[in-house]
């Protein structure tokens, strides 16, 4: 039997940003499974956040859950593989980067600052100029402001010039709507592909597929058929087309 897999980004793809999964998405994913597609989700978020968005136990219907870009691998709620950023980047470099970002954000003139500007996850550093504690209203204000003033892209360029190096190559990418993710260059979302074994056909669906976005590498991987989506409704439409051809 041909082994086929569908891999999905979370925010902006399976769900609206930081919202729970819609029943229409659940229904079509179940139809995909009945057509013998395996399904997986890969997100920069922590596992607990992914689990909360895939509510009512729906996470159990995924064959793989790849949190933190695929460096934390879960199969049926069991962690089977984990990478730690502190084992890949020297502590002195991590500390200097965090201190630099806090000073940089302190001097930013942006609509709101709400706290939790730096989040140290197991395998990546999440930098959030408005703060991860921001409300949905705050989030929308920053998204609009960032689309005009390019706050994140400017910070990304500064971080690249300050902290990327040949001896410790790092990726600095736009994550979701309001953040920047920092991780070793080899730990993009495409690392998830190394955990699924031999697969005949792999489709990836994501919204942040442009260069500089955190879906770019897996979307452009030679073993992957990449699909750019504009939201969960567009995802449903694209999956309907895929099922019609299956």
UniProtKB/Swiss-Prot annotation:
It catalyses: alpha-D-mannose 1-phosphate = D-mannose 6-phosphate. It comes from the Eukaryota. NCBIfam families: HAD-SF-IIB (TIGR01484). Belongs to the eukaryotic PMM family. Transmembrane segments: none annotated. PANTHER family: PHOSPHOMANNOMUTASE. The active site is at 9 (nucleophile), 11 (proton donor/acceptor). GO terms for biological process: GDP-mannose biosynthetic process; mannose metabolic process; protein N-linked glycosylation. Homodimer. This is Phosphomannomutase. One of its GO terms (molecular function) is metal ion binding. Mg(2+) binds at residues 9, 11, 207. It is found in: Cytoplasm. GO terms for cellular component: cytosol. InterPro entries: HAD-like_sf, HAD-SF_hydro_IIB, HAD_sf, PMM, PMM_cap. Pathway: Nucleotide-sugar biosynthesis; GDP-alpha-D-mannose biosynthesis; alpha-D-mannose 1-phosphate from D-fructose 6-phosphate: step 2/2. Involved in the synthesis of the GDP-mannose and dolichol-phosphate-mannose required for a number of critical mannosyl transfer reactions. The keyword Magnesium applies. Alpha-D-mannose 1-phosphate binds at residues 121, 132, 139, 179, 181. Its EC number is 5.4.2.8. Keywords: Cytoplasm, Isomerase, Magnesium, Metal-binding.
């Amino acid at each position: 039997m041909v082994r086929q897999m569908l891999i999905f980004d979370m925010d902006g793809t399976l769900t609206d940003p930081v919202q729970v999964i819609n029943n229409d998405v659940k229904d079509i994913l179940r139809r995909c499974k009945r057509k013998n597609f395996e399904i997986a989700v890969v997100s920069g978020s922590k596992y607990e956040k992914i689990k909360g968005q895939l509510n009512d136990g729906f996470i159990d219907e995924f064959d793989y859950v790849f949190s933190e870009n695929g460096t934390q691998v879960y199969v049926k709620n069991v962690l089977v593989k984990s990478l730690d950023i502190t084992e890949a980047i020297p502590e002195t470099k991590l500390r200097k980067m965090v201190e630099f970002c806090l000073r940089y954000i302190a001097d930013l003139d942006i609509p709101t600052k709400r706290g939790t500007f730096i989040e140290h996850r197991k395998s990546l550093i999440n930098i959030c100029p408005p703060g991860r504690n921001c409300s949905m209203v705050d989030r929308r204000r920053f998204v609009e402001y960032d689309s005009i003033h390019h706050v994140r892209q400017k910070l990304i360029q500064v971080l690249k010039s300050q902290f990327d190096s040949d001896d410790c190559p790092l990726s600095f990418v736009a994550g979701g709507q309001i953040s920047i993710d920092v991780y070793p260059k080899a730990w993009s979302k495409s690392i998830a592909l190394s955990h699924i074994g031999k697969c005949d056909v792999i489709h990836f669906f994501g919204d942040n597929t442009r260069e500089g976005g955190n879906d770019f590498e897996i979307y452009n991987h030679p073993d992957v058929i990449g699909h750019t989506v504009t939201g969960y409704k567009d995802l449903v439409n694209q999956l309907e087309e895929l099922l019609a051809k299956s």
